[in-house]
Amino acid sequence: MAAETLNFGPEWLRALSGGGSVASPPPSPAMPKYKLADYRYGREEMLALYVKENKVPEELQDKEFAAVLQDEPLQPLALEPLTEEEQRNFSLSVNSVAVLRLMGKGAGPPLAGTSRGRGSTRSRGRGRGDSCFYQRSIEEGDGAFGRSPREIQRSQSWDDRGERRFEKSARRDGARCGFEEGGAGPRKEHARSDSENWRSLREEQEEEEEGSWRLGAGPRRDGDRWRSASPDGGPRSAGWREHGERRRKFEFDLRGDRGGCGEEEGRGGGGSSHLRRCRAPEGFEEDKDGLPEWCLDDEDEEMGTFDASGAFLPLKKGPKEPIPEEQELDFQGLEEEEEPSEGLEEEGPEAGGKELTPLPPQEEKSSSPSPLPTLGPLWGTNGDGDETAEKEPPAAEDDIRGIQLSPGVGSSAGPPGDLEDDEGLKHLQQEAEKLVASLQDSSLEEEQFTAAMQTQGLRHSAAATALPLSHGAARKWFYKDPQGEIQGPFTTQEMAEWFQAGYFSMSLLVKRGCDEGFQPLGEVIKMWGRVPFAPGPSPPPLLGNMDQERLKKQQELAAAALYQQLQHQQFLQLVSSRQLPQCALREKAALGDLTPPPPPPPQQQQQQLTAFLQQLQALKPPRGGDQNLLPTMSRSLSVPDSGRLWDVHTSASSQSGGEASLWDIPINSSTQGPILEQLQLQHKFQERREVELRAKREEEERKRREEKRRQQQQEEQKRRQEEEELFRRKHVRQQELLLKLLQQQQAVPVPPAPSSPPPLWAGLAKQGLSMKTLLELQLEGERQLHKQPPPREPARAQAPNHRVQLGGLGTAPLNQWVSEAGPLWGGPDKSGGGSSGLGLWEDTPKSGGSLVRGLGLKNSRSSPSLSDSYSHLSGRPIRKKTEEEEKLLKLLQGIPRPQDGFTQWCEQMLHTLSATGSLDVPMAVAILKEVESPYDVHDYIRSCLGDTLEAKEFAKQFLERRAKQKASQQRQQQQEAWLSSASLQTAFQANHSTKLGPGEGSKAKRRALMLHSDPSILGYSLHGSSGEIESVDDY
């Protein structure tokens, strides 16, 4: 057989895949009615051709595609690891099958039309693997790439996936076509162009040609499609006609798919979540050899599930190795709760076939101790009609049939007929015994039942708004799956089992029906103080501000937990003691129709439970009064207020029914008991205390910060004061030195010629005014550095006496003025050829103008590079200087002056390179200018800026620029020396012009021409006396 199927593709392609991909369902052409391609490839072969490194085509890299373009191509799903959600899907622990089916997503739909070629549960939600279990097949072992089972499972519906992605609506329509018998054939095939269709056609061709080994595997045309004969002559499929007549003794129009499986499921424990669910219409049990190999279970390779760690757990088929009792019970409960609509669509007929005396749907739901009463109402009974009829109009009539059937499930399940029925009863008994120990109540009420049946898409409405507590689904759980779809409602028992199995992450968004919004599971656990799915008191609905509620509930529950635990234990013991009568009641309800039981049992039950109540009240602390425990419990157990007593009995799990009637009769569950009030008071008090503590802590912290800030400010202030003190002392010292110096200068006797001082001082005053702009520049720099109060104007130096003049100048202007006027003191002697008789104070009135002019020249000369005037003065001393003068010059160099380009460059570079910003840049520049040796320059820069490349580069550039600066200064100095000597000689000649003859006078006049200099060199013109200017112009 296998040899025939190896000839699918060309030799090279078979070699590529190791020839082992017989089991892969190859992709199909779009329309099955055309002639099929000669070459069809398996999934491994196609995966082998997938190139991961393919780049985005250039034409797609346009801006218009930027919004939809992804740089990384999506991998084939087979190569991607399964998500957490998909792993959970394998055990059908994640979504209610009914919800999936109603959404048109598959998950083992019991509708005849959906099962083609692979068994009824082959169609998987979103094309990502069976939602109930993992089918191990030969694919796994000898696939070309040896993919792990998870990955194979991931892509078992390789070609379904793309089609599902784009043809959902068609699939949904097609899913129902099976009901319409012959006429539905073509639509069915067109609705789903996937591997089943091409395989079925191929099998038919091969049957005609070779008498196929896969006899009867392909669906037949039209009416025959589900009624083809199996090799043993009996009806080969669990068709919804033959099988119903043959095995059920009554006819079902709805559940052909599942028909043949009742036996297997009944024995196997009926757990759709972990157990292998039957694969009709191929009739696995009867017709294994009538199916294609890839669709059959290997004898060695059974189906199974994955546990939380990802390990594969093989599960033998039900009839061969029944599952241990406890596991069975778990699974039974899980299936019933987790697939609410199974009450109609799976459990119903299955219940009819497999357990002919089923729990009615509502009881199935309540068999799990869960605080969510409406699973049954939601999807059960005519959920099929109400929910799916809207989604799938084409199948409306079939839905109506389903509706007629499913109340039958509740009311007349049919007479017990088979071995299955006895086993079903056994299972019910065992389950009842096991669940009797659980505390929660999930009773159903008729009003809720009908309301829920009329509510379409309750999942979404429940998710969007909080349901009232009286609503059946108010205490059930909803969650958002990773795709953002809301799943639910699920009972607490289901959620607890999935949580224990490790399916829920802490970030899963969950909510109860009565809560307003979704919250991460981790938050809910913190808020409740326990796992919310475990038995225990349930907090009130979370409405409004979630954060406040979260804190409140957390503390409230922590306080109530211990107290409630005791009540629960006592209650458990009391309930367990009434186990047998309740079991009997339950069986009665299961066997009979759902009419109210005869009056005596409810009355007895009521009396018994009233006795329970009295015993329970003895347990209560005195503070609470009669209703301390009961309202809280009734609220936490989500028992609705209304509802007839018989309702509770027939629909609830045994002890839960009793408990419900107990709470319903004596208490109105909507009243809030004193316990809750006390808890809330305690909680408020605790909150208030926490707020006070927090405020106190914040106040202390604030005080600490303020204290720290105050200390820092004081330190800062102290440092600033010290700096100011230092600066002030420095200035005082400079002032003293200047005064000394000036006093020494004044010690030279001044002839008391009455006419000489006025012109001299007038000239000086005029000069002071002309220097004002330079001084302002200097003062502005100093003001910026030291934030000193603005100095007084130098113009105040117009006092007729030089002492008054000195006192009138401000501190900084005095320094600057004296520094600028420095050449005055040594000026005459420098160029006077050693004539000690000619001092500043000895000049005649005539010479005053020339001297002042000489002074103006000096000042204007030194403005472009004032720093050089000092070195110029100290570099060529002609007369002796005292130590005070030298100190004064050094001090003056530290005072900011108008900067030349070189100094500015130095300061900018140092500011830039000083990483900490703590470097005293002006001081560093002054020192660098004084340091002669290049090595010393390098050392000093290294000490200031560190041994970095930038520092070395700066040192190098500094030396080069300084050399250029010095060269230009020397040239300037020579020129200035020559000019100053000429001006002094002119002044001398003008002073003694009366003694000279006319020839000498003209010679002197000619020499005065040398004073004429281009203003562009100095930056400004010289202001001498008007007579001098005339003498220049005369020439």
From Swiss-Prot:
Record domain GYF: where: 474-522
Query: What note about domains is in the entry?
Result: The GYF domain interacts with GRB10.
Q: List the biased-composition ranges (Polar residues).
A: 629-639
Q: Where are stretches of biased composition, namely Acidic residues? A: 295-304, 324-349
Q: What is this protein called?
A: GRB10-interacting GYF protein 1
Gene3D superfamilies per UniProt: 3.30.1490.40
Q: Does the keyword Phosphoprotein apply?
A: yes
Per UniProt, subunit arrangement is: Interacts with GRB10. This transient binding is increased under IGF1 stimulation and leads to recruitment of GIGYF1/GRB10 complex to IGF1 receptor. Interacts with DDX6.
What does the function comment of this entry state? May act cooperatively with GRB10 to regulate tyrosine kinase receptor signaling. May increase IGF1 receptor phosphorylation under IGF1 stimulation as well as phosphorylation of IRS1 and SHC1.
Residue spans of biased composition, Basic and acidic residues class: 148-179, 186-203, 239-267, 388-401, 696-722
Tagged with keyword Phosphoprotein = yes
- Membrane-spanning residues: none
Q: Choose any GO biological process term that the UniProt entry carries and state it.
A: insulin-like growth factor receptor signaling pathway
For the region Disordered, what residue ranges are annotated? 105-422, 621-640, 696-724, 825-879
Tell me the organism. Answer: Homo sapiens (Human)
The record's GO CC annotations read: cytosol; protein-containing complex
* A Pfam cross-reference name: GYF
